[in-house]
Amino acid sequence: EKGLSACGFSGEKHVLLMMGGSLGAVKLNDCLREILPELTKTFDIIHLCGKGNLDEALQNRTDYKQFEYVSEGLNDLFAAADFVVSRAGSNSISEFLALKKPSLLIPLSARASRGDQILNAASFEKQGFARVLDEDEMTAETMKKEIFALYENKEKYVVAMEKSPAGDGVAAVMTQIKALMR
């Protein structure tokens, strides 16, 4: 698989993809890096950390691959990931739903945004597609707890996404085309 190969991963461990948004997210990056030794016992980690947020001390690890930003090949990284930790922007979470990727969503707080990510995350949580962690309550320890809870229950989230008509864009488009042909 291209994503695994691009990261130098063997495919023997589950893969966690961490995305902090287009500019990264310092608090998310810091928490993830603090618990990295514990997480990498179980997971290989792809970390999209944002421009200027690479940690040079972590560059040559075989179980952790960091990128400032990815445009070419992002689809391969999504394909390689078993689950995702991310902000809750509408484009990203729509991708997670379409690809059936269980996610831990950490929306921007109301102080830092219009509140749309909070609503997006709440909707996904209510539908059983994701777990949500409030950034104001997030510590490295709560992030670790939530990541492992997501991992241990990932099938539950996949089943919920598979049952959702919102997750099957092709079927929705075909239904519309057939309706127009009548």
What does each model-identified segment do?
Residues 166-182:
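C-terminal alpha-helical cap of glycosyltransferases
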Residues 147-155, 177-182:
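Short, hydrophobic alpha-helical segments
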Residues 5, 155-167:
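A short, well-ordered alpha-helix in the C-terminal region of glycosyltransferases
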Residues 4-86, 118-120, 133-141:
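Donor-nucleotide binding loops and adjacent catalytic segments primarily
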Residues 22-24, 108-112, 163-164:
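Short histidine/acidic/glycine/proline-rich micro-motifs that form metal-
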Residues 74-114:
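A donor-sugar binding/catalytic signature common to diverse glycosyltransferases
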